[in-house]
Amino acid sequence: KGVKPENIITQFNVIQDSLEIWVNDPKPQPDTFYVSVRYMKTDTLGMLNSAVDEFKLINPNRKTFGKSSKKDIKHEDTTAVVKIEAAPETVEQYGFVMEFKYPIVESAFDSLKFISINPKQEESAAGYTVTQDTVNLRKYIVRPKDKMQVGYEYKLKLPHRKFRDINGFYNDSTEVKVS
């Protein structure tokens, strides 16, 4: 109640038994949310019927603005955390997998640098495609446009401040290399 539907991001897990909810609104939010969930429920006769359940969600980790030591603040608390993985033996099939800790609300995938390095160690820009995972909205797959060549190394560079997560934090630069 009180949050516009366009400011809510939801995602089910793989087996569809858990729902993750994020509020995409920079304004301070209350520590308690009341959520109405409308779904199809099986009754005692095995028939599907529309049902509405109300849930009270309390944030047990709500951060209070008090005195906190700078020692308590970790780097992950102030940046959009992204993990990039690529296995050399499967990178051609599965690509470079980028997974953000939280949903991103601003992105600049055209700023990625995909570089091929030939056996003479000469670098050249290579084309790539980006697709969002169909199950996990925080995961993106970066694949080369051209067939990968034997003996070449490939590097994916993510420049800093090109992606902003739902918490308002920007990413750090990172680089992953496979051969």
Where are these regions (language model features)?
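N-terminal targeting or signal-anchor segments and their processing/structural boundaries
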Residues: 1-179
